[in-house]
């Protein structure tokens, strides 16, 4: 029940984010003297509408987005006689850019507001990858009976018997130097018998010997392959996890800005790798193991939202929504039509071109003919639609689940 509720709530949150994105365009367009004919949430048949002033507001039947119909976005649009002077393409460049940027800006504002709220209520995590193999705890070695399910074990584990304890930093195991906990775990899984281990405690290097215990773990034999039981080495240690940092009303402001900056860098890295993940998506659709690092659609995002609510992880719900808004804003600034960034690029191009022409004593050129750009726009749309269909299919047949 809570899982279904979470899906619905996250889908509604996405729709609200899209509606606010369009509100950004609407508000700035009206503020700069442009005419907005229609503002609608959803597509398809109209369920409800009302007119306020010169703008018609409404809700349509298919809740998969929204639109803001600004008069004269392009020079090829047909205008009424009283609309000509207020056409968007005739306005000053700064006004056009402001209107176009306002949509993505709303997504960024939503992201910042959510991060600020998380900082106050739950605290902010550290997004930076660990650079040392810090031991968080030691324990006995339990066999993984099923995926994510460990058996019982008692007594100290090999690491504890070798003298390791929480807070120690492992720098070398066997003949291999390690820099992160994941590096160390990968090395241990391949070893057996008694091996030397070097760790630091209070700045002092200590060498000991640890008995690698063979145990069962569910492992992937290759990228995207199914998890299968395998016998690997283990020493009974857990990673050190940094607790979220809590902030006050004022201290949360710079913390939010810093965290948003770090998150932007991480999101940028993820977006750049999307083309390399498409093969893994196709593999997942065919029945292979779904890589949790593969891109997802709003369907997959809603499923993740359902998982977070089902397990009471509201902080993850809001954080994921903040991240999604950051992604939506960034994608919309891509300088290609039909994205907002494509329209911004055209407005800036026209301004630079006309400045050069004016400097040469030549009359300004006509606005860019969008009809000539339609072939390129269609190419982008084909890729976008194909990407959406691919991710939606993967999310329906083999979704990413947080707790399975």
Swiss-Prot record:
Signal peptide: none
Record-level Gene Ontology MF annotations: metal ion binding; metalloendopeptidase activity
Biological processes annotated in GO: proteolysis
InterPro entries: PDZ, PDZ_6, PDZ_sf, Pept_M50_Zn, Peptidase_M50
Keyword Transport (UniProt): no
CDD domains reported for this sequence: S2P-M50_PDZ_RseP-like
Binding site for Zn(2+): 21, 25
Transmembrane segments: 1-21, 104-124, 314-334, 373-393
Annotated GO CC locations: plasma membrane
PDZ domain: residues covered: 121-203
Cofactor(s) for this UniProt protein: Zn(2+)
Location(s), subcellular: Cell membrane
Catalytic site: 22
Topology in membrane: Multi-pass membrane protein
Annotated Pfam families: PDZ_6, Peptidase_M50
Keywords: Cell membrane, Hydrolase, Membrane, Metal-binding, Metalloprotease, Protease, Transmembrane, Transmembrane helix, Zinc
EC code: 3.4.24.-
General function of this protein: A probable intramembrane site-2 protease (S2P) that cleaves type-2 transmembrane proteins within their membrane-spanning domains. Regulated intramembrane proteolysis (RIP) occurs when an extracytoplasmic signal (possibly oxidative stress) triggers a concerted proteolytic cascade to transmit information and elicit cellular responses.
Family of this protein: Belongs to the peptidase M50B family.
Protein name in UniProt: Zinc metalloprotease Rip1
Organism listed in the record: Mycobacterium leprae (strain TN)
Name of the encoding gene: rip1
